[in-house]
C-alpha cells in the first residue's frame, strides 16, 4: 500500500503505539534516540498534512459551505447554512440546535463568538465539518480575470 510514511516511520509509530519509549525503539532499530524522535516528528507532520488535505478535498466537494468570520455570533450561522442549502437545493439534516451544539463542540468558539475565521460545511455524506478558510482565495479569484 502506498503511503506518505517511510518504512522506518511506520516502525516507529507502531512501536510507540505499543507504548515503547523512544530510547527502547532506538535500541530495537539500532539507531539513536534523537533519530527516532526526528522520525516520529516527521511522521506526525505528514499525517497532519494528509488529514488537512482530505479535509480540504471534502470542503471542495461539499454540498453547502458557509464562511464564518472572527467575532461572528454563532447563533447567526445555522440560518445562513439553511439559506445556502436552499439556494443549492440541498436539505440540511440537522436542526438549528444540533448545528449550534456541533459548533460549540468543534469550532473555535468562545462566549458565542468565533475566535478566528473558519468554514462550516456539509460534506458529501451529510456530515457537518469545520475547516480553516483554506479555499476562499480560490473562490474569490474566480471570474476576476
Curated annotation (Swiss-Prot):
Keyword hit for Transcription: yes
MF annotations from Gene Ontology: DNA binding; DNA-binding transcription factor activity
Record's keyword terms, sorted: DNA-binding, Transcription, Transcription regulation
Biological process according to GO: DNA-templated transcription initiation
Any single Pfam family the record assigns to this protein: Sigma70_r4
Stored SUPFAM superfamilies: DNA-binding protein Tfx
Top-level division of the source organism's lineage: Archaea
NCBIfam families registered for this protein in UniProt: PRK03975.1-2 (NF003055), PRK03975.1-4 (NF003056), tfx (TIGR00721)
HAMAP family, per the entry: HTH_type_Tfx (MF_00620)
Functional summary from the UniProt entry: Putative transcriptional regulator.
Sequence similarity: Belongs to the Tfx family.
Protein name: Putative transcriptional regulatory protein PYRAB13000
Species name: Pyrococcus abyssi (strain GE5 / Orsay)
